[in-house]
Every structure is written in structure tokens, then in C-alpha cells.
Amino acid sequence: MAKGSKRVVRKRAEKKNIANGIAHIQATFNNTIVTITDIAGNVISWSTCGTMNFKGSRKSTPFAAQIAAEDAAKKAMEHGLRSVEVRVKGPGSGRESALRALSSAGLNISVIKDVTPIPHNGCRPPKRRRV
């Protein structure tokens, strides 16, 4: 008996129809990660400087953060996103440029929050670099 060939049927990514969301910008010294979620925290789209083909020290530039934020915003706007609440975390150089890129991509920014974690004298920080 011949076996019938089984064809794998993949589900297409559904287009969610979401008007409001949250844009999380994590700006570290080496990279910038932009994640756009709905109000509940489910990820709609994301982008990083590394996925936009910036490698090494070029990932930490404001221009790379701008390109990554524009990419994440375009992906999210395909799902119907119009306005976002922005939460910025970290001390990196891509904070402001990623924020500007989100607004210039066509998203309406309602609130900007800085959610950088600040220790109340917790862990010992890394030692100073001697270059």
C-alpha cells in the first residue's frame, strides 16, 4: 500500500485589528530593542538594530535605533495600530531617536514614560573601564 503524502498546512499570521498599544524601547549601550504590544502585553511587532543589519558598534548609534523603530512601527500599523503609549528603558543613545521615529512613522504618541530600573543600592555595579 502506498502512503498518501501528507501536506503541512500552516496558518497565516492573523491581522489583529488593534487601535491602541504600548511601545517598549529598551536602549542599552550596545543595542536598541523596540517592541510594540497591545494593552494586555501581547507582542504585535518588534525590531532591533541587529535585525536591521547593523553589526558591532554601529548597533549602538541613534541612526540604527531610528531605523529599527520605523520598522517596528510599520509592522504594527499593518495590524491597524494608530496610537501608542511609549515606555523607555535604559541609558542608551537610541532613546530619543527611536521616539522621534515612532511619531514620524505615523503613530500618535499619547504618553511617554521612563521605566528605567533604578536600584535602591542593590547589586554592586561593574568596575570602571581603564582604556
From Swiss-Prot:
The keyword Ribosomal protein applies. One of its GO terms (biological process) is translation. Pfam families: Ribosomal_S11 (PF00411). PROSITE patterns: RIBOSOMAL_S11. The keyword Ribonucleoprotein applies. Transmembrane segments: none annotated. GO terms for molecular function: rRNA binding; structural constituent of ribosome. Keywords: Ribonucleoprotein, Ribosomal protein, RNA-binding, rRNA-binding. InterPro entries: Ribosomal_uS11, Ribosomal_uS11_bac-type, Ribosomal_uS11_CS, Ribosomal_uS11_sf. Signal peptide: none annotated. Gene3D superfamilies: Ribosomal protein S11. GO terms for cellular component: ribonucleoprotein complex; ribosome. It comes from the Bacteria. Located on the platform of the 30S subunit, it bridges several disparate RNA helices of the 16S rRNA. Forms part of the Shine-Dalgarno cleft in the 70S ribosome. Part of the 30S ribosomal subunit. Interacts with proteins S7 and S18. Binds to IF-3. Belongs to the universal ribosomal protein uS11 family. This is Small ribosomal subunit protein uS11. It comes from Syntrophotalea carbinolica (strain DSM 2380 / NBRC 103641 / GraBd1). The lineage of its organism: Bacteria, Pseudomonadati, Thermodesulfobacteriota, Desulfuromonadia, Desulfuromonadales.
